[in-house]
Amino acid sequence: MRRVICAFVVVVLLLGAVTEAKASLYNTHIADTDTISVSLLTASQGKQIYEKFGHTGIRIHIPSKKFNGVYHYGLFSFDEPHFEYRFVKGETDYMIGLMHYHDFLTMYAIRGSSVRELPLYLTQEEARLLFAALQENMLPENQTYRYSFLYDNCATRPLDIINRSLKGEVRRDTTDTDLPTFRTLIHESTGQDKWVTFGLDLMLDGETDEQISLPDKPFLPHITEYIFQTTEIDRNGTVERLSGTPKEVLKAREDVEIKTLFSYVTPMVFAISLLILVVLISIKEIITVSHSKITDTIIFSVCGIFGIVIHFLLLFSEHPAVSSNINAMWLHPVWLIVIPFIWIRNTQKFLYCYHFINFALLLLFFVVVIFVKQQVGAVVIVLVMALLIRTITYLTVERRRKHIR
């Protein structure tokens, strides 16, 4: 009984301490004698698509005030009205949030991610300026900002606000020209999920094939961490490193990946299988002088649906890197318009004209790919070849029909 009572007392005291600590996050006044330590937290990627790129937080620790908070940008809610539509449109507003340090670690422990902590050697004046700026950001009128996937996200905002707090000449190595492109970094982040990688490749244009800009726009959390690790600052003639040695404060959970049949059906496997199937069906059509309406209906439907998404992004979205996508040449809504004519009699002339124009457009696509900076990938080439074969097959069958008549 005595052990139970002791355990109960300990739990109550711990809960009280945690509650007091959390309350202090929102009610902290700094005195001149208070010491502030600052560090950068970098979380590794998670399993959900919005977790694939990791996360960044700024830890502010004021022991005398029992303040141990993490400010982090990039908060959003799926419950916001029309969130999905606004996200595709590029009109989503993200927020800055504040969590207790231990809650931050718990959140990522549940997710299975690792967290690294990089101590930043800010002076007390700089730390106070940073803390004041973060607190000002937390005001309701300043809490939200317009999200940009490449240029204004959870990795860029911490870099910007810390930079504004520094007093001295910041020195960063800008001689490295062998920098990765945005697309390369995206592939590194989503590499385990081939379908996510393929989907993003379809939607993003040549802007993502430009090199990232250091130290201005890091794009990803681990790049922000790297920037601070390689930064020096000249304070009154004394050059010092801005950061210490990073340490892992939370280890990633090693989950056993369960392989399913779908795991082996990668976009490339699917594309090659489709190409082989299309070749076999097309050969049969040419021999029998007929058209497989079901085959074309399925293929045209998929291309048309994806085409609606691609053209919506191209014409209406405010997101960067979607407004000059050459995939719009072969993924477009016109495929859907053509489908009814496949099943209507006496529409051969219309379909012949469409396929003739489409044949020229698909050939032009292969030419454009050579000269533009956008990397479309081997999967797209295989899929476009399948479409080209369907178009050539239709034109060939119709020509044979004319000769038979």
What are these regions (language model features)?
Residues 34-113:
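Glycine-rich catalytic cores of cysteine/serine-nucleophile enzymes that process amide/ester linkages
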